[in-house]
Amino acid sequence: MLVSYNWVKEFFQDFPLTAEELGEAITRTGIEIEGVEELSASLKNVVVGEVLSCERHPDAEKLNKCLVQTDEAEPVQIICGAPNVAAGQKVIVAKVGARLPGGLKIKRAKLRGEVSEGMICSLAELGFESKVVPKAYAEGIYVLPAHVETGVNAITLLGLDDAILDMAITPNRADALSMKGVAHEVGAIIHQKPAQPTEPDVSEKGKAEDFISVEVENPAETPYYAIKMVENIEIKESPLWLQTKLMKAGIRPHNNVVDVTNYINLLYGQPLHSFDYDKIGSKKIVVRSAKEQEEITTLDGEKRTLQAGHTVITNGVEPIAIAGVMGGEFSEVTENTTTVALEGAIFSSSSIGKASRELYLRTEASIRYDKGSDAWKVEKALAHGGALIAELSGGTLVGGVVEVDNREKAVNKIETSLTRINRILGTAITLTEIETIFDRLGFVLEVKNDALIIEVPTRRWDITIEADILEEVARIYGYDEIPVTLPATSTTGGLSDSQKARRVMRAYLEGAGLNQALTYSLTSKKDATRLALSDEKTVALSMPMSEEHSHLRTSIVPQLIRSASYNIARKNMDVALYEMGTVFYATEGDNLPIEQEHLAGLITGNWHIADWQKTPKPVDFFVLKGIVEGLVNKLGIKSELHWKQTEKEELHPGRTASLVLEGQEIGYLGALHPAVEANYDLKETYVFEINVAALLDATKEKVVYHPIPRYPEMTRDLALLVDKDTNHAAISQVIKEHGGKLLVDIELFDIFEGESLGENKKSLAYTLTFLDSERTLVEEDVQKATNKVVEALQEKLNAIIR
């Protein structure tokens, strides 16, 4: 969130900190400030000018010769190429000697033979990003209101004598997604209470219920919904103070109605939405769940297909807005709007978050609803917004609101004690200091003997347990003020064997090129049973927050598939992920579920990316098979991993294998079924999942390091003709069993199938490597070992030596 330093100061009478000091102080209390930008650092000598005359440049069709009055005694001539410059305008002028962002210094110059003594500026040339410049001025200079005095400092007028704090708001601090919330935080830091925003004093006329009625079909998804009416309005540009506040917050001004809703959202953290009342097409608003495949064209001009479960605002027939996300083009406020229905509501955070993610539509409103908000500030925000629209548009504020209120206000009281606070924090804070801290935070404190009962304001919905209270005390008291104390007893550090093994697995997989993923343990009912290692029953939550998170997972792979799909939708086409996490299986009765640790992985796209030396290599079954085999070897497991062809729902029937270790099936590896890949917009994708406990319990052998051989090795090539259903693993096993102690390596270097070999036959070629670490091998030794291998292959596999 971008926070204006000057706007923060408006909440306090005497502000003691510079912008840099404020950023450091906020960071110390737990909200990270990613940067502080002084807007006027590269601006100098910029004033308001009046264009006295404007005529076409005699030698340049696209240039204008303007006579401009600034703060100097005489007007100056400025050559300007903006298409919208005209006589009579109040404009921003960078005088000769002025400095602008990017290191640009304005000099007296000649343009096509005409002298230019300065520059008429656009907002972008003053440092505003193009995405926040009003569309009317996107291609030209910015025209100031006519009442602005000529010659005044334009830097001050535009609010550029300011600093912007870039705040990284964590999900638990949604209260700081508003200027009021920031002011509360800052007030606690500087020991001052912030002033409350005051709304314009506008008289009301009429009754809102004469204009519209409201019906809410699902109160759980919409606990509060209200409409405030403003009529006889005139749509025009917002005043300069409002435009500059929005632009500095990263929001583009539109008009005096839309800008007020954005301003109130910034001020209170409460999204509002404005409907053109005459376009609604009904005198009744119905808030309901969307119908499957219902469509709406949103304000950005995109036609969006809704899903059942998305909350929509309708006129009783068709949607006019996606609740908490974005309004519909159907009821958009335009220059012809005369009556506005202003919406203020509280929507379920899980519902809005789900809709925002599924529609790939993230807005300032959805961000605030998704993170959660104070359900009791909406009336104040709606009243302020309605009054401000009436004041800025010359409209009539209609009396009252039409509302449906199903909120339940519960007082949030948490108990702790001074003794516990000091014992846990390691401090010696006095009761007086505690009282001061909670007063600064705006919390109500009641002292009963040693007990402290704290009533938490509704704006801090993130505070629910005693630990949260202790954190607040530590934050405001100052983390740097808490004394450093050594542990009372010594502890012996060290990792257990299983911890070491897990670290080895993570390091190996990351070294192999996979990235660690962390996904939810909660999933949907459908995903809970997909691709599981076991057929055990799933565990359902008794009170799930949403259908998407109603069950505990029995497999990690479905979540990795969703993660891969999410990445590919954002043009990250080559994905390699792994996750080590817990899956859950139901037990009989009310017993706790069985928890099992699994390791899962997924690869899709290219394994090797193309460059000037090589072509891209797509992922395949053997890439992932090699990674899994390497993992088993890295753990020092003595037994060999066996691969058994199998079939599993949602995996490719011809490219799926179960993993068998020490006679026990411990997992699977395979390609996703093409139908699953198509459903998630994936290319060829391979996955595996292994029971971690089986890996940890497998017999290990100690790693013994051998010196580098002093004697040369000898090799023999064998080409075998075998049945088509004879696999490499079976051949390799026979060779190992009969190759003797001199055989140190087996390498498959060729596979051939063709009509010339005969029906259902294939040829495999191997290189066998022999080595004796104590002497030089002789031909007789190698031939003897090779003969034993050949005899065994002929006897056990009916192989023909070619």
Swiss-Prot record:
Amino acids binding Mg(2+): D462, D468, E471, E472
Family per record: Belongs to the phenylalanyl-tRNA synthetase beta subunit family. Type 1 subfamily.
Listed SUPFAM superfamilies: Anticodon-binding domain of PheRS (SSF54991), Class II aaRS and biotin synthetases (SSF55681), Nucleic acid-binding proteins (SSF50249), PheT/TilS domain (SSF56037), Putative DNA-binding domain (SSF46955)
Record-listed E.C. numbers: 6.1.1.20
Entries under NCBIfam families matching the protein: pheT_bact, YtpR
Name of the protein described by the UniProt record: Phenylalanine--tRNA ligase beta subunit
Cofactor requirement: Mg(2+)
Keyword tags: Aminoacyl-tRNA synthetase, ATP-binding, Cytoplasm, Ligase, Magnesium, Metal-binding, Nucleotide-binding, Protein biosynthesis, RNA-binding, tRNA-binding
Compartments where found: Cytoplasm
